[in-house]
Amino acid sequence: MDEYQKIAVEFGEQAIDETVIQDWLQAFAYQGFDARTIIHNLVQLGGKSWEEDAKKMIILSLTRGNKPKKMVERMSPEGAREVKSLVAKYKIVEGRPGRNGITLSRVLQPWLGGQSKLWKWLKTSYQSQGAQWTALCGQTYPRQMMHPSFAGLIDPSLDQEDFNAVLDAHKLFLFMFSKTINVSLRGAQKRDIEESFSQPMLAAINSSFIDNTQRRAFLTKFGILTSGARATAVVKKIAEVYRKLE
């Protein structure tokens, strides 16, 4: 046995400290952004106008997506100037932001549960119509589910069957949305497409920013859960559509 083989054998025979391993697992686990930090940064960078600016960014996120550089190419000069001003003021980034980076989608997240009224009049925009998802599942797809940030409202303390139904119904949107915005995924296998959105989705679900009681209240208000905290029949049917996709 040479020196390196000996090192390998000795390493493999070392005792495992489960407490230390668990600490490492928690330290190295994927973490999404902290919504509290996003709010703090908005207030600090925006001063007195941060609330008005946040509303503008929420509208942009819901109607035009998460990529300011691309959206200004097809926008009125006035609108383009406003977007560029917001990008500069709040240091808005796109692509792969760091944990504390501000994106349009992240600005939406802290207030997603309170934005239900927006969906009632944002009916002509690409992301709020939902025609392709409704046509695909044969049900009226819940508009509140039609944004990646919705995962932050899914209550992980629901009964497993109902949690899975809400999760899989939302995955149908994420699946179709991912193929729409990422050309390389359009011919990909279902598992590969799901892998592309699973980490941020799970991070949002496991976030502590909105507690489970409040999440459940939002889901009930949106008609995604019944008053008894069960997934509605529509949500269950949509979930089945996703499960049958190949």
Curated annotation (Swiss-Prot):
The keyword Ribonucleoprotein applies. This is Nucleoprotein. InterPro entries: Capsid_Phlebovir/Tenuivir, Nucleocapsid_Phlebovirus. One of its GO terms (molecular function) is RNA binding. The keyword Transmembrane helix does not apply. Encapsidates the genomic RNA, protecting it from nucleases. Displays high affinity for single-stranded nucleic acid. The encapsidated genomic RNA is termed the nucleocapsid (NC) or ribonucleoprotein. The ribonucleoprotein has a non-helical structure. Serves as template for viral transcription and replication. After replication, the nucleocapsid is recruited to the host Golgi apparatus by glycoprotein Gn for packaging into virus particles. The gene is N. Its main location: virion. It is found in: Virion; Host cytoplasm; Host nucleus; Host endoplasmic reticulum-Golgi intermediate compartment. It holds the Pfam family Tenui_N. GO terms for cellular component: helical viral capsid; host cell endoplasmic reticulum-Golgi intermediate compartment; host cell Golgi apparatus; host cell nucleus; ribonucleoprotein complex; viral nucleocapsid. Belongs to the phlebovirus nucleocapsid protein family. Keywords: Capsid protein, Helical capsid protein, Host cytoplasm, Host Golgi apparatus, Host nucleus, Ribonucleoprotein, RNA-binding, Viral nucleoprotein, Virion. Homodimer. Homohexamer; ring-shaped, necessary to form the nucleocapsid. Homopentamers; opened pentamers in solution. Binds to viral genomic RNA. Interacts with glycoprotein Gn; this interaction allows packaging of nucleocapsids into virions. The N-terminus is involved in homooligomerization. RNA binds at residues 30, 33, 67, 105-106, 186, 196. It comes from Sandfly fever sicilian virus.
